[in-house]
Amino acid sequence: MNLIGLIDYVGEWSTGAIVLRLVSALIIGVVIGIDRGIKRRGAGIKTHTLVCLGSTLVMLTGQYVYNNFVGNMDISRLGAQVISGVGFLGVGTIIVTGRNQVRGLTTAAGLWVCACLGLAVGIGFIEGAFITLVLVIITLKLLSKVDEQVRNHSKGIDLYIEFENNKNVTLFIDEMRKQDIRISDFELGKSK
């Protein structure tokens, strides 16, 4: 069986095709999860795999209901609920550190795209899922290096400074102006 034949087979509704869809979701979740695990993120292999498998099963369930029950059923509604639910899961991965750094955005986006990939696999759009998987891996691997280069060559920096009183803030700003350093943005808040 050639690749086109395999893709056509996976698009059918049979036990073998269902198994292939779920195994494809497992592979996709593991591949994305490995990248996050290597970077020691909270959502790693197991989380990404479960999200991808679960969303695949939801889409398979939608297709099953559509194929086997009389009535008008919009199978996209189940997928929409998966995306909504994964949004809540993703929020749990995003934190703001004590130094006002936002962490976990890539993990949240990875969980979201993993759910989308699972939905694509579940409905039988295997070729789209694997093409997207390749692009996701390129994004996580290659673009992180590009992002690092952009940050390293940026002329701006982010500073997090704690002052004991407002007078010191004014002194700091005055000193920056004397040194001809431009402050493009700043935020003040009371310490906890």
PLM-predicted stretches and their roles:
Residues M1-V70, D74-L78:
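Alpha-helical transmembrane segments and their membrane-interface boundaries
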Residues G29-I32, V58-M59, Q63, V86-T93, ...:
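Alpha-helical transmembrane segments of multi-pass membrane proteins
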Residues V30-R41, L89-V102, K145:
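C-terminal ends of transmembrane helices
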Residues I38, V70-M73, T97-Q101, G122-E127:
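Membrane-interface helix caps and helix-loop-helix hairpins in membrane proteins
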Residues L50-L60, S84-V86, A109-V121, F163:
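Small-residue-rich segments of transmembrane alpha-helices in multi-pass membrane proteins
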Residues M59-Y66, T93, L117-G124, K141-V150:
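Juxtamembrane membrane-interface segments at transmembrane alpha-helix termini
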Residues I75-W112:
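Ordered, amphipathic secondary-structure segments that act as subunit-interaction surfaces
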Residues N100, F125-L188:
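Canonical alpha-helical transmembrane segment with a positive-inside/aromatic-interface signature
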